[in-house]
Amino acid sequence: MKRVFFLSIALFVGLTGCSSAPQTKGAMYLLPKAEPVTLSSSDIAQRPTLVVRPVILASYLNDNGIVYRTSETQVIQAKHNQWAHSISEQITQRVVAELRHKQSHYWPTEMNNLLDQSGEAKLQLTLNKFNGSYKGNIEIEGGMVTH
């Protein structure tokens, strides 16, 4: 009888341990939004348009998983910590908002295939790095081209 009792307890504890194992929940992240700029339509109309093309990301960044560098030579892409929305689109929107805030010569706008923007000035950003680091820093590296 004792043997059956101890076997039952062991089985119960074993099954309870398996069923209460922590389940990893994923988290979704967005970049912080920039403050919107409020200008009159006449102020906007006086500025030449600057078309901000979608940011081009290095291939290892162009996915939903947040990228983290674990050593000088290794990067990993998170499975449970992901971007809630395309990081390329988020960065493009943030660049447009920041340029509207921090300069007054152009009126930055996102590329729009429904409008003829062929004669407008254009800005193309490319990011080779946009990741966290094992040193506790964020790494951002890239370039820009204007037309």
PLM features: what roles do these ranges have?
Residues 1-6:
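Bacterial N-terminal signal peptides that target proteins for export
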Residues 14-17:
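C-terminal motif of bacterial Sec signal peptides marking the signal peptidase cleavage site
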Residues 20-39, 102-147:
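Surface-exposed short loop/turn segments
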Residues 33-53:
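N-terminal secretory signal peptides
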Residues 47-115:
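N-terminal segment of the mature soluble domain
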